[in-house]
Amino acid sequence: MHLSEITHPNQLRNLSLSQLRSLARQIREKHLQTAANSPVGCHLGPGLGVVELTLALYKTLDLDRDKVIWDVGHQAYAHKMLTGRYHNFHTIRQKGGISGYLKRSESRFDHFGAGHASTSISAALGMAIARDRRGENFKVVAIIGDGALTGGMAYEAINHAGHLPKTNLMVILNDNGMSISPNVGAIPRYLNRLRLSPPVQFLADSLEEQLKNLPLVGSSLSPEIDRLKETVKLVTAVQNNKAGIIFEELGFTYVGPVDGHNLAELLDAFELAHGISGPVLVHVATVKGKGYPPAEAEQVSYHAQSRFDLATGKPYPPTKPTPPSYSKVFGHTLCKLAERDPRIIGITAAMDTGTGLDKLKEKLPDQFVDVGIAEQHAVTLAAGMACEGMRPVVAIYSTFLQRAYDQIIHDVCIQKLPVFFCLDRAGVVGADGPTHQGMYDIAYLRCIPEMVLMAPKDEAELQRMVVTGIQYTKGPIAMRYPRGAGVGVPLAEEGWEPIPIGKAEVLRSGGEVLILAYGSMVHPSLQAAEILKEHGISTTVVNARFAKPLDTELILPLAQQSRLVVTVEEGCLMGGFGSAVGEALLDADIRVPLLRLGVPDVWVEHATPEESLAELGLNSVGIAERIRAKVEALQGQRASQAQAILGSS
């Protein structure tokens, strides 16, 4: 059977092992061809590692009834191909195409959407409890990676499920030893020992079957069989690094470890697990990037890939040179400063490469901490370090810092601790879509007392703000910066001067329209000013630098002299930078028209950053068009008012 003929996952139920193996090969081929030719890139390693797992599991389920919850979602590419999306799989992560993650609105087989890690067991348990309350009996399966299992939420769900012995729930642990980078911590180390242990549950259940088949006495031995099963499991566990005992003690029946690329073994394990009452965990050992040697060899870089040569695995060179990314400039600058200040500690939550902290990890490993997928712990860990005089720098994507909001308020801000938050991927992130957009940090941080917010206009100003953040000791401070390449300005290797807290700068003066731009929107605003000049509209452009505190000493007098004030930000309008300016104008009783440009109250779907910014009107052309339309509308209003005055006289 060809993969293109699969329109419903239940078609797998009647296929032979050889047919499943053929589908596994086809899935990998389709995935690789799509990744190699994608204009926006896509996740690769995670999906290649779960092909056999997906096929074997779906063969044992009735997916018209049963529900599978995938953690994060970037490991669910085979799932997408098997659930009616094969023919448009080539559009994945592109504007108007299918999502790179699971979306309930995209398919009836996507039972729970996710882009952040560690949520699957909680969601699956909720569905299982609801099922039992309604008296139904479908199966619920959560598939979670060992990286996501470093997140505390996963253990909260396991703790809850373990106290519900009558609630049937299967958790499949997809253990490849990686998140994006290699996993850290005691739990991954424990799981790695389990990967090397022979199956435990198989031994116990095999013994039970043999004893029950004894003539005359087999059926009367149930209590003794149970005790003997436990003895076998305990003895086996002790001999094999106590395999699975943690999960057993938490109330789960442990099955595994199972070879995640052996279809026959997977089928046996899943059928066995389906027959076990209560919560069960199936431990499946997989290889990230399985079936594509370059991805198996370079598991970090092939977690996700842009266009590459399928024959060699090497990425195609860029069509033109690009400036270094904000992340790389941040990592380089922090590393330079850390070399001279041993108090500086870089902290990340399983994203050392993505945040640029890999350079610090390599050069100064004693000044680098990776906590795993544990943002809450990262923030409070930093708070504890700050209490002891260290200078913790928490580098986290804007979207992931949301997960530690209580810790920011309760553990950092209330205590006025000098923790420096560096929010990568702030604003539009592109093909990852709404689960990863960094739209909300200005709003959710601006409302917190003691918090300082800043954003650089370019990569050179970012270097100065890194110094500013480290030197600021009066309380918490946050810096946001976008994904991707910098503007292309010259960069100094040292001698970066801090920026005075709350001080903006005028970049262009003398206009009747005042443009207050924040962070990544400064350069598009300067370009928009040139476009407006061609239409006879003069502008003053200010690099705000700080959303909190605002430079009211600079902004308010300029606003009083202007016919229109415009704020531009790459973030949500509700509660954002524009709201801060509006509040300041209102408090000062300055009555001037205000145009706020930013992200409206909508979810921004996946597309390239350029496509998203154009659609939002946040590129130079869009900014100029919105301002020009507003100026013309105001001129029309003034003309109408003047005409009304003349008419009344």
Curated annotation (Swiss-Prot):
GO MF entry, a single one: thiamine pyrophosphate binding
Record-listed E.C. numbers: 2.2.1.7
Keyword annotations of the record: Isoprene biosynthesis, Magnesium, Metal-binding, Thiamine biosynthesis, Thiamine pyrophosphate, Transferase
Cofactor: Mg(2+); thiamine diphosphate
Cofactor note: Binds 1 Mg(2+) ion per subunit. Binds 1 thiamine pyrophosphate per subunit.
A Pfam family it matches: Transket_pyr
Binding-site residues, thiamine diphosphate: H74, G115, H116, A117, G147, A148, N176, Y292, E375
Cross-referenced SUPFAM superfamilies: Thiamin diphosphate-binding fold (THDP-binding), TK C-terminal domain-like
Annotated binding of Mg(2+), by residue: D146, N176
EC top class named in words: transferase
Keyword Transmembrane: no
Catalytically driven reaction(s): D-glyceraldehyde 3-phosphate + pyruvate + H(+) = 1-deoxy-D-xylulose 5-phosphate + CO2
CDD domains: TPP_DXS, TPP_PYR_DXS_TK_like
Keyword Transcription regulation attributed: no
GO biological process: 1-deoxy-D-xylulose 5-phosphate biosynthetic process; isopentenyl diphosphate biosynthetic process, methylerythritol 4-phosphate pathway; terpenoid biosynthetic process; thiamine biosynthetic process
Functional description taken from the UniProt entry: Catalyzes the acyloin condensation reaction between C atoms 2 and 3 of pyruvate and glyceraldehyde 3-phosphate to yield 1-deoxy-D-xylulose-5-phosphate (DXP).
Family per similarity comment: Belongs to the transketolase family. DXPS subfamily.
Assembly: Homodimer.
Name the record gives this protein: 1-deoxy-D-xylulose-5-phosphate synthase
Organism: Synechococcus sp. (strain JA-3-3Ab) (Cyanobacteria bacterium Yellowstone A-Prime)
